[in-house]
Structures are given as C-alpha cells and as structure tokens.
C-alpha cells in the first residue's frame, strides 16, 4: 500500500486534495498561498512523514511476533467464564487478556504469565456479551491480538419465604419473596396432601402473591412455586396450606301443624357442610318462660315440638354443630292455637255518599286483627278493610252512592278467623246525585235533570210547587229517563222540585233542586267590569232589548249581602262608575233592566278593588298664552253623570284647568262660567263670579262631582237660559262660546237646543270622552267639525287634545277681527353664520314685527323686533350647517298675531381654495390662498 500526502499551492482545491490524500486529512493534506510559503509547512510535513515511518516500522515488527491461537470459552456463569488459548512462540513472556462489554464500556486487563494459557474472568454482568482480546508479550513487544466474544448467563434462583394466608373454605392466598434475576413468570402447583389431581396456575414475574380458588373445604394442600427465566426454570420453593371447614346456618325455618294445645312441627333447610348435630332451642315469649334445648342428628331437617302451652307464642332457633364448633342459628316464631270468637254490637254511623263508618265490641281472646268485608246488594262489587286487633272501628271508603251494602266483621286469630258479625247500611246520594239541575227556563216551563239512582228503580216521582206557596204537582217518570219538562208554570216564580226514586222495597234517596221561571222582561247583556281603583270600578253593559225605562245597579262585597249599594241610571246609559267601595275587596254587581211593569233578571258581574290607587300623571300645560284685548264670555258645560266616576272627574278638573289657564280673566277680558249636569243641571258659578285668574283656578280645583244620568239636551237648554243672560255677567259685545264635555249618549233630545246656539251666534265646542256618541257630538258642535268637535277613547287621552282645543278656543276669543299675521315668508342669503328673512305685512298696519328663531334640533328660542314698516331682517350669530325654525308675528300693543312659520339651514364653513406656495427657501416659504 502507498500512503499519499497532498500539498496544494495557491489556487489548489482542498476537496480535491482530500480525495487524493490518505486519511486522516488532518495530517496528510496541506495548503499554502504561494511557493514562497513552503517554509511555513516544511517542518510539520517532515515531522508527519517521520512519525508515519516509525509507526510502519513498529507494525512490521509486531506482525513478525507470533500471536496465541485457538481462543475458547468455558465454565460460563451469570458473573464469570473461563478463557483458554493455545500457546504462542516459546519466547513469550506472558499473556495480556483484555475484555470489555461488547456494546462499549470500560476495558479491563488481566496478565497471565507464560506458559499458563487459561484464566477465569470474574465480576461480570449477567446476560452480557463481552469482547475478549489475548496478546502475547515478547521482549521485542506485543503480538497481534487473538479476538473472541462470549455472553454470560442470566441470573437464576429460587423464591423464598412461602406464606399461606386468607384461608376460606374453598380458597387461600399464597405469597413469596421474589426469586433473583429477571423472572418471566411463576408456576404455582398444588394438590391435596392426601392425594388427588395436581393443578397449577401461572402468574407474571412481577407478582408476589396469588389466590388459589375452587379448593376442597377442610383440606391440606402441598404447594410449590417455580420461577421461570428466559433460559429455563429456576429452583422450586415448597410449602403447605389448608382450607377451612364449611360452617353456615340452616335456612327457611318453618312452623306447621300447630294445634290448640301441645305441639307444632318445626322444619328447616339443611345448613352447609358436615353438620354433626342440630341444637334446637324453644323459648316462650311470655314473661318468665323456660328455655328448652334438644339436639337432633345432623342429617335431620324436621322435628315435632311437644308438651307446649296452648295459645302461646314461642321464639324458636336451630343451630348447626360442626367439629370445629357451632355455626349460625336460624330463628323464627311460632304459636299454638287458641279458641276463636266473634265481635259484638255492630254500630253503623257517619254515612256519606262514598263512606260508611262502623264500630263494634271487641272479640274475646288474642285477636290479631279484624277483617271488615262488604258486598253490594245491588251488584257483585265487594271489598274489605283490615285493622289491628286493638282497633274496633273503621271507615269503609270508595263505595257507590245510594247503594245498600251487607257488612261483616271477622276476628282474626293465629289459628284463623272466628264467625262474622253482620249488618246492612245504605250510602247517601252523592252531592251531584242529591241535586236536581234546572235548565232551559222559559216564562212557563223549565227542564229538570238528575243523576240516575242505582239498583232496580221502578220509576221516579217528580214533585214541584211554588216556594211562596201554592198547589203541589206530581208527575211519574219511567226508570230509564232522568229528565223531564215541568209545564204550566207561573212566570218569574221560584219552584222547589223533588225527585224520588221508587223501588219495590220503598222510596230511595230524594233529589232536590229549585228553579225560577224567566221574567217577561229581557235583561241587559255582556256585562264588563274595568278600571278598578282603591275605591271605584266601572261597570259597562249592552242595552236590554225592548222598551227599557232605565237600569238599576246593585252591588255588595262577595259574601256580604248586608252592605248593598243601589243606583238608577237612564235607558240610554250603558256604563256607570261605582264609588265609595272598600279597598282590595271582591264585589258582586247586578244590573237590572227596568220596565213599566217590572224589572228583568239581573246581569251579574264581579270585580275586585285594588289595594292602592295607581299614580296618574296630570295633563301638562299647553304653554299657550292667549293674549288679546277681545272680550269673551265662555260657559263650560261639564257632564257629572255616574258613568264618569270620581277618579275620572279629577282628570276632567285638570283638563278644565289647562283650558282656562291660558286666558286673561277679568270683567274687561275673558269671563268663564261652569255648569254641571246629569239628571238635573246646576250652575257651579256664573260669568261674573270670578274676577281674577287665581280665583277661577281655585274654583276649578274644587269643582264637586254631581252624579246622575246623562241629559245633555236639557243641560244645553239650561245654560242658554241661566248662564248666557245679562243678569249674571253676560256682556252684549263680548264673543260668546260654550264648551260641552260629555262621556255618554244623551237621554233626551239635543237637536233643538243645538240649533238655538247657532241661531243666537254662540260658538259651541263638543268634547266627547270614552262612551260618547260621535254622531251626537257632530250634531251638537258648531261647524266645521274639524275645529269644534273632539272625541277621545279614554279620559287619560284628554292630554292629546288640550293644545288644539285651547288654541282653537283662543282663536274664537280673538274672533275674525283679530290681528292678522304677516304672509309669504322668504329666507335668502344664507351663510355659515346668518341668513335673511323677508315677509309681506298684513293688510292693516302694525307697530312692529317679532322674529323668533331657534334650532330644529332643540335650543333656547331667540327673538328680534323690527319696526312695522320694515319687512326684512338678517339673523346673525347662527351655527354653521344648522336648520332653524323661524316664526314672524304681527305685534300691536299687547296683542300678538299667530306666527308665520318657516325653516332655513345655514351653510357649512367653506374649505380653503387656490392655495399657492412661493419664495421657497431652505427653511422658509410663503403661502397664500
């Protein structure tokens, strides 16, 4: 072989040099920048070449020395083996045995002097492969090595300390101390010492115990445990164990064949195991009773107990006896028989439709209980009750109504039942069965219906007569029929009706009822109660058919007829508010139609008052101030009928306050009178009564509630004759206005009085609430209806019309000759902060104009005044890009016109335009725009 050193100069590629040179490249490849640099590597290159020459000379010399031969291994154990070889040349001084784990690890050396050619390597790891090299030593050096490998055996041994624990009759637990080494499994063998089948189980090598099952009881076993290794079995560990004897208890102890005097038979199921004898104990349960013990053979399971006391209870036990001792006893009870008797004096009481109560005098002797049997005499239904021996009464339940039963009471003894005590009883009719139901009433007939009676009914006898007295009528009805029509009755009369089932043996339970024939007068319909408060609620109904003359309403707390309230309303009224009621109380309401010859049956309703009144929000002020020099006489005609009620009348007062508060009250301005009407109208105050607004507002706040029927026509006539006249404050040149507030249909004519208002030049406003008749309101109000007629569905909705009504009444006060507003509003010249407002003045001259403006989105109104000859102005100081309301008023003295209204929006702030940069330097420039 040729060993190559590679030297690269200047641009030589090192990877090519490494491919050419002999490994290792660290000592065989060199590079220099140019030829002048050879001096730098010459010493290192020369030294490497000389070192390799010395190594080759030494290798040649070693190869000339004779190595040992025929390496072999013997006596292999888990921690040692013997190494042997054939000798080398005669001049060998000694042998070096080098060994190490084949997978890597520390190397060990043993020197063996020549001519010995064998040695034992010790302290080795079990089941481990070792690499062994044997070198012969000569004076000139060491020979080449003789190499080989050997593997130690795995550790094998025996487990120790065999233990047997947890013995039962068919198992015990075997435990041991583990065997050394890597045990794969343990094989546990066992067989009875006295001989028998050998069995074995296998457990994992990491287990330290196992339980042997299905063993023979009371048997000694020989047990051995052998560890198994990968290389084979280890040494066995032997020992002995034994199961326990089977010990138990007999089962199902039974007493049979008791007699009245001396004996009873005792039987049981045998106890498990080898029972030698049974110990039988007998103990009287009475105080001071002796204990008797007798033994019988172990193969016996029955015995007769003799010489016992009659009528006596005994505690019994049977205990198995084994060679190892006593087992567990089974216990029971038994009793000899005693003489039997019967209860006496059967009493039947507390009978209802489904129950019968019974009691009796106790039977003699040791009674364990009573059985009470019952059987229907009408059908095959039967049943029974059971009570303890110290109880002498019971209630039979779930019986059929109106049924005859035979009852039997049996005394129950340990030896059986005595003779029965018997009797008979009949249940009452059921609550529904006692009742005759009345339906389909007319003026002269009614239908009677009842539940069928049980059993073999021959017929039903129907008896009826007027409750107030009169001739009794009797009818017979077939047994299959349970209803009949009673005829030839008197109208509006209450009858008492009885229905008696008739049997062959006699009469059954009577059914009773009552009914009233109809009135010839029809009742109102569809009653409805609503709007409950702490002391009031509303009652509404649909009118009764026919020529009704009015309605009577009675009411009282539920269950308290003594507190009966009553009121009358007219034929056109269909609603009323009941007042002065108790808080949180349920009331019954009756509404009768009243006719010339009598009244109808009642229409009945129910309602419950509340614990407290719900808060009501007052009607807000309109905010209007009716400023005018005009004079006006206003009369308010207020409906105070029962259909309004006090809570709603408070709302009416609040509504009147909101209407009248806008006017300037005085003898030279506006005067207001109020009249209230129902059945008969009355003046609350005249036009000239209140000279100031404060006095008027106080009077409105204290306006009393009148109550009564709704007679609107006579009320309109009343204020024409009593309020619109000079003697009570009416002024000839003042404008005359009437305002009607009503919640119902008028009971009298309204056409003629309404026409008189138009004829006399009085403007008439009509405000209807809730139940008002809209056609009637249009007939009453002045034209047009859009200005003079209002109708709302509820009192709480008056707040929705107060502003419009107040404004229209104010315009009526001002009259057609009032101050006219300007016209033709034009806005122009808008900027971000201003715009111009222009208008056309009214036909008459005015002192000045008021211009009011404020943002549409909300804000405080601002105003400016200009002379009456000026018809334009610029509003300044505004917000950019904002929409404004604008109102322009004509002003003359203290009088102000209606507004001329419009809107305008300011412009947004404009952005910069035409920006130019010039005179630009290194740190400055000029900007213009």
UniProtKB/Swiss-Prot annotation:
It is found in: Secreted, Extracellular space, Extracellular matrix. Residues 1-49, 633-805 form the VWFA domain. The triple-helical tail is stabilized by disulfide bonds at each end. One of its GO terms (biological process) is cell adhesion. InterPro entries: ECM_Regulatory_Proteins, FN3_dom, FN3_sf, Ig-like_fold, VWF_A, vWFA_dom_sf. Keywords: Cell adhesion, Collagen, Disulfide bond, Extracellular matrix, Glycoprotein, Proteoglycan, Repeat, Secreted. Belongs to the fibril-associated collagens with interrupted helices (FACIT) family. Its main location: secreted. Glycans are attached at residues 98, 231, 324, 415. PROSITE patterns: FN3 (PS50853), VWFA (PS50234). It comes from Notophthalmus viridescens. One of its GO terms (cellular component) is collagen trimer. This is Collagen alpha-1(XII) chain.
């Amino acid at each position: 072989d040729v060993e190559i050193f590679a030297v690269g100069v200047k641009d030589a590629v090192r990877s090519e040099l490494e491919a050419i040179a002999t490994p290792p490249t660290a000592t065989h490849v060199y590079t220099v920048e140019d030829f002048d640099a050879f001096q730098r590597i010459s010493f290192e290159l020369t030294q490497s070449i000389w070192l390799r020459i010395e190594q080759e000379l030494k290798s040649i010399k070693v190869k000339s020395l004779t190595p040992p031969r025929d390496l072999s291994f013997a006596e292999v154990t888990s921690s040692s083996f013997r190494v042997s070889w054939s000798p080398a040349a005669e001049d060998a001084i000694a042998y070096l045995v080098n060994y190490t784990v084949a997978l890597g690890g520390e190397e060990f050396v043993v020197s063996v002097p020549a001519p010995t050619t064998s040695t034992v390597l010790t302290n080795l790891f079990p089941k481990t492969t070792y690499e062994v090299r044997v070198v012969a030593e000569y004076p000139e050096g060491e020979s080449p090595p003789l190499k080989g490998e050997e593997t130690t055996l795995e550790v094998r041994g025996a487990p120790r300390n065999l233990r047997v624990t947890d013995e039962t009759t068919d198992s015990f637990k075997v435990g041991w101390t583990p065997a050394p080494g890597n045990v794969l499994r343990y094989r546990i063998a066992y067989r009875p010492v006295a001989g028998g089948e050998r069995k074995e189980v296998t457990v994992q090598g990491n287990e330290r115990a196992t339980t042997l099952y299905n063993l023979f009881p009371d048997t000694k076993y020989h047990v051995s445990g052998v560890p198994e290794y990968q290389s084979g079995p280890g040494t066995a560990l032997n020992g002995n164990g034994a199961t326990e004897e089977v010990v138990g208890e007999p089962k199902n102890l039974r007493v049979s064949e008791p007699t009245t005097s001396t004996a009873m038979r005792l039987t049981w199921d045998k106890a498990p195991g080898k029972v030698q004898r049974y110990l039988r104990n007998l103990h009287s349960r009475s105080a001071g009773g002796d204990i008797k013990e007798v033994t019988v053979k172990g193969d016996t399971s029955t015995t007769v107990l003799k010489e016992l006391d009659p009528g006596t209870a005994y505690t019994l036990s049977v205990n198995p006896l084994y060679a190892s001792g006593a087992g567990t006893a089974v216990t029971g009870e038994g009793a000899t028989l005693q003489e039997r008797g019967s209860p006496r004096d059967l009493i039947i009481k507390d009978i209802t439709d489904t129950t019968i109560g019974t009691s009796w005098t106790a039977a003699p002797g040791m009674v364990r209980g009573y059985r009470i049997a019952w059987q229907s005499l009408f059908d095959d239904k039967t049943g029974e009750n059971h009570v303890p021996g110290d109880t002498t009464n019971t209630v039979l339940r779930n019986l059929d109504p109106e049924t005859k039963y035979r009852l039997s009471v049996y005394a129950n003894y340990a030896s059986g039942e005595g003779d029965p005590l018997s009797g008979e009883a009949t249940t009452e009719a059921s609550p529904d069965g006692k009742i005759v139901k009345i339906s389909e009433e007319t003026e002269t007939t009614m239908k009677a219906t009842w539940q069928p009676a049980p059993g073999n009914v021959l017929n039903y006898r129907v008896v009826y007569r007027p409750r107030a007295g009169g001739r009794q009528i009797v009818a017979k009805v077939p047994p299959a029929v349970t209803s009949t029509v009673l005829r030839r009755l008197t109208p509006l009369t209450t009858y008492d009706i009885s229905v008696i089932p008739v049997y062959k043996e006699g009469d059954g339970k009577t059914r009773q009822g009552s009914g009233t024939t109809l009135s010839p007068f029809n009742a109102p319909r569809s009653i409805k109660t609503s709007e409950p408060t702490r002391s009031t609620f509303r009652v509404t109904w649909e009118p009764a058919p026919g020529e009704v003359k009015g309605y009577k309403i009675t009411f009282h707390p539920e269950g308290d007829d003594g507190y009966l309230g009553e009121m009358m309303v007219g034929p056109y009224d269909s609603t009323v508010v009941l007042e002065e009621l108790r808080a949180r109380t349920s009331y019954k309401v009756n509404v009768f139609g009243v006719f010339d010859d009598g009244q109808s049956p009642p229409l009945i309703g129910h309602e419950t008052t509340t614990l407290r009144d719900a808060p009501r929000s007052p009607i807000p002020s309109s905010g209007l101030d009716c400023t005018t020099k005009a004079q006006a006489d206003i009369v308010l005609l207020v409906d105070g009928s029962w259909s309004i009620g006090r809570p709603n009348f408070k709302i009416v007062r609040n509504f009147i306050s909101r209407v009248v508060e806008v006017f300037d009250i005085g003898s030279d301005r506006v005067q207001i009178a109020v009249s209230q009407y129902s059945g008969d109208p009355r003046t609350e105050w005249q036009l000239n009564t209140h000279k100031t607004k404060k006095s008027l507002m106080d009077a409105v706040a204290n306006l009393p509630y009148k109550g009564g029927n709704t007679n609107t026509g006579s009320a309109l006539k009343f204020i024409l004759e009593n309020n619109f006249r000079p003697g009570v404050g009416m002024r000839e040149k003042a404008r005359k206005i009437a305002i009607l507030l009503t919640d119902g249909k008028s009971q009298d004519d309204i056409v003629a009085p309404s026409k008189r208002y138009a004829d006399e030049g009085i403007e008439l406003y009509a405000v209807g609430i809730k139940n008002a008749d809209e056609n009637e309101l249009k007939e009453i109000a002045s034209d047009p209806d859009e200005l003079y007629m209002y109708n709302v569905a509820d009192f709480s909705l008056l707040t929705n019309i107060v502003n419009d009504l107040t404004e229209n009444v104010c315009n009526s006060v001002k009259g057609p000759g009032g101050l006219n507003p300007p016209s033709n509003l034009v806005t122009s010249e808008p900027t971000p902060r201003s715009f111009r407002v222009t208008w056309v003045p009214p036909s008459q001259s005015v002192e000045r104009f008021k211009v009011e403006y404020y943002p549409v989105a909300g804000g405080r109104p601002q105003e400016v005044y200009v002379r009456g000859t000026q018809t334009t102005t610029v509003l300044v100081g505004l917000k950019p890009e904002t929409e404004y309301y604008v109102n322009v008023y004509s002003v003359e003295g203290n009088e102000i016109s209606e507004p001329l209204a419009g809107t305008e929006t300011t412009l947004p702030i404009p952005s910069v335009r035409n920006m130019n940069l010039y005179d630009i330097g290194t740190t400055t420039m000029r900007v213009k725009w």
